Amino acid sequence: MELSEWIDRHAGLEPGKTAIRFPERDLSYAQLAGLVERLASALKASGVAHRSCVAYLGYNSPEMLATLFACARLGALFMPLNWRLAGPEHRQLLADCPPSVLFVEPRFVAQIDAFRDALADVTLVAFDAPPQGWISYEALLERSGDAVPRDPQVGPQTPLLICYTSGTTGKPKGALLSQGALAWNAVNSIDLHELSADDRILTTLPLFHVGGLNNQTTPALSAGATVVLHPKFDADATFDAIEQERITLTVLVPAQLEMMIARPRWQSADLSSLRMITTGSTIVPERLIREVHRRGVPLVQIYGSTETCPIAAYVKPADAQRKAGSAGRAAPHCSLRIVGDDGHDVKPGATGEILVRGPNVMNAYWNDLQASAAVLKDGWFRTGDMGHQDGEGYLWVDGRKKEMIISGGENIYPAEIENLLGESPDIAEVAVVGRLDERWGEVVVAVVVPLEGRTLDAGHVLQLLEGRIARYKLPKEVVFLDELPRTALGKVRKDDVRQLVARKTFMEQT
């Protein structure tokens, strides 16, 4: 089967049920199925064929999801673009994977129109008055004709989604995910969340990342649930939706949770409809987990990446407090290994690189054989994350392999120090990086963002660690910032932090 059959099936079973609830308008499953059908026909009339690419630049919207399912019907590739990127970055991605059709929401039209000459073979679609050389969304839909028959060549093995990695270092890579990867990911999500047609999902994460698209949104539509979709995250709008829409499930990354907890409204908000909140994308501070549990809502962690669609492991709600801080066990249709530098499995409790295998893992990186070969070996995806498993098989993520600090020959994992400092009620954010040092090779630097209204000094920060970790792990320097640089999904850009620390050191020495 191909993924648009999910929508058709529920349109047949409950045509009037709300599939997507968006500000000021709802789409029933029948209406969503009709839009997908019309859009697929219009795209086909515009030259989109099997393996063609369709790109979309805009905030979360029903049209964005409909485009994904229309591409699934045609066997085409859907490429959602990160609206936080600058024009030259979008130009780079569109050159890496040239689309046949590019949908652009109003706020971003000028940005794309600035390099329109480089998109001569692309049908450019605007949602309001189109510039010269563009067409309107309505004009595109008018190209639709007869229903598009299902193509027997389109199935689970057919590539569907190109999601570019966050690009925390170097050139972003496009992870190529098949229709089967999204389908198996939905099965994993349904198991974790016990998803059913009765659920009401709130999506605030951007759909241009697998975290927003596939943690709950596409799984919810596969289950016939209702997705309450926000264009982008706003803390107060999130509170409103949870209370007024009686939301049962949502995904919030730690940075979003921090913003909500900082609001006075957090203490009294009605969260009684929530069965759980799912989080991930970065290591989750234990104080954050405790605070959400204090409000009576299980906070469950997912482990995964763009390349795993993303769900590879998770903690079930029953274990959320007992295993606070763990990324859980392997999802039902995934396997995990922890391997040492020799490629052999390490013993429980020992740290090694996390490997993932399963039908939800990407096919390859688009247009990058070398990078694909480096991470896909013998059927396993090498995540680049370091972690260990306890005696019960629960995964604990220790940090990125490339972020490990080697000081005086000793291996130091930043996540250990970050977790300890993150417990402090005076610290909002922390990132630990290495700085080059003539004597030790590298030394530890803690970059700290104090909680608003709090005053900290280096001595206070170091005191939080004294006696809790080996002395060689203690930061040799503490840097204070107002905020940390982050990706769209809330991951700290460690390369930017390292560069900032290096510049500071250089300025002090000159």
From Swiss-Prot:
One of its GO terms (molecular function) is medium-chain fatty acid-CoA ligase activity. It comes from Aromatoleum aromaticum (strain DSM 19018 / LMG 30748 / EbN1) (Azoarcus sp. (strain EbN1)). The keyword Plastid does not apply. Involved in degradation of indoleacetate, the most common member of the auxin class of plant hormones. Highly specific indoleacetate-CoA ligase which catalyzes the ATP-dependent activation of indoleacetate (IAA) to indoleacetyl-CoA. Also activates some closely related compounds such as the non-physiological compound (2-naphthyl)acetate and phenylacetate, which seems to be a fortuitous substrate for IaaB. One of its GO terms (biological process) is fatty acid metabolic process. Transmembrane segments: none annotated. It comes from the Bacteria. Monomer. Keywords: ATP-binding, Ligase, Nucleotide-binding. The keyword ATP-binding applies. It catalyses: (indol-3-yl)acetate + ATP + CoA = (indol-3-yl)acetyl-CoA + AMP + diphosphate; (indol-3-yl)acetate + ATP + H(+) = (indol-3-yl)acetyl-AMP + diphosphate; (indol-3-yl)acetyl-AMP + CoA = (indol-3-yl)acetyl-CoA + AMP + H(+). The gene is iaaB. This is Indoleacetate--CoA ligase. It holds the Pfam family AMP-binding. Inhibited by high concentrations of substrates, and by the synthetic auxin compound 2,4-dichlorophenoxyacetate (2,4-D), which does not serve as substrate. Its EC number is 6.2.1.75. Gene3D superfamilies: 3.30.300.30, N-terminal domain of ligase-like. Belongs to the ATP-dependent AMP-binding enzyme family. It is an enzyme of class 6 (ligase).
